[in-house]
A protein has these predicted regions:
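Terminal amphipathic alpha-helical/low-complexity segments used for targeting or macromolecular assembly
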Residues: 1-130, 262-303
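General structural feature for long, well-ordered alpha-helical segments within catalytic domains
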Residues: 61-64, 135, 229
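Short, surface-exposed recognition loops or helix-turn segments adjacent to catalytic cores
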Residues: 80-84, 158, 172-174
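Glycine-rich adenosyl-nucleotide cofactor-binding module
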Residues: 107-159, 163-164, 168-171
Length: 303
């Protein structure tokens, strides 16, 4: 190794030296794994990243996904630019990853040998738990969590929950909705059944969505702005950055109107839809936290 980001094949001699070096630094568990690799029938590969550049190869891409799922890097804190162009579309089966071009032949061969070759997915990303099972989590349907998801200890993901790569939860959360790419949910926040967060891959632009502590997205709700702490979005309400929001004080009196993006990141907000007028409303017991002087529309406030 002579510096930079490199991918190197390791023979038995190199693995022996690696195991010895790991043992000397106190990494006994990794040293034991390196020793096991010496008996593999597959080529052992070491991927070294000195710089956080965009992944230039499949091993570099998968290493970064592993760093996320091992909780060594939080979402949006490593460069994943161009990852889709680097990774290949693969059939993920009960016999491991199979090249799409070889899949039909492998299926026929399995039938001839009276074996079952089950294709779990055809994707660039495998399910996380085939490679990483973080401590202290519950995942009801493991196929709905991709490798590269960051799942904090104490998180429960129910059957309808989904977590994309480069997204996830900080700690204790109940996930029954979709956490899209780039979205990070802080501790104590819950996503109700069928709820959705807007990511940066499809339609979300470059707005990175963060959900603060102790928030709730109601069932079938949607979120396109970052939330501060202790916020609630009522069931069935989808908020985008351009949604016009009527602001109410703690006496339910209208104090102004603004776009939802102006409320991004603010604490103690409740978003709801008026069932009579259809207007999207925002309430808080801390009216000053709305910071109305930043709103683009003129408003009059009596406090």
């Amino acid at each position: 190794y002579d510096g930079g980001n490199q991918v190197m094949s390791l023979d038995e001699k190199a693995l022996t030296e690696l195991a010895k070096a790991l043992e000397e630094t106190g990494e006994t568990a990794l040293a034991a794994i390196a020793e096991q690799f010496k008996h593999s029938t597959r080529t052992a590969v070491a991927t070294i990243l000195e710089n956080d550049d965009a992944p230039a190869s499949v091993p570099e891409g998968y290493l970064k996904l592993h760093l996320l799922s091992h909780r060594l890097v939080q979402p949006n804190h490593t460069n994943l630019s161009g990852l889709f162009g680097v990774l290949l579309n693969v059939a993920w089966t009960n016999e491991g990853a199979i090249d799409i071009a070889e899949l039909a032949d492998r299926q026929i061969q399995a039938r001839l040998e009276n074996r079952n070759l089950s294709v779990n997915s055809v994707d660039k990303f495998p399910k996380m738990v085939d490679y990483v099972v973080p401590a202290g989590v519950r995942i009801a349907d493991t196929s709905r969590v991709r490798l590269g998801a960051y799942i904090g200890e104490g998180t429960t993901i129910m059957h309808e929950g989904f977590v994309n790569f480069n997204a996830g939860t900080e700690s204790t959360s109940m996930v029954e909705g979709r956490i899209s790419q780039g979205v990070f949910v802080k501790s104590g926040s819950d996503l109700g059944g069928g709820s959705s967060t807007m990511g940066t891959l499809s339609g979300g632009g470059n707005i990175i969505i963060t959900i603060g502590h102790q928030c709730l997205l109601g069932a079938n709700s949607g979120l396109g702005i970052p939330l501060g702490d202790r916020c609630t979005v009522e069931a069935g309400l989808y908020i985008t950055s351009g949604t016009k929001v009527t602001l109410l004080d703690d006496h339910n009196q209208v104090v102004g109107q603004t776009k939802a993006r102006e409320l991004a990141g603010k604490d103690d907000l409740l978003f709801r839809r008026n069932s009579t007028t259809g207007t999207v409303e925002c309430l808080t017991n801390k009216i000053r936290s709305i910071n109305l002087h930043n709103c683009k529309l003129p408003v009059t406030v009596s406090l």
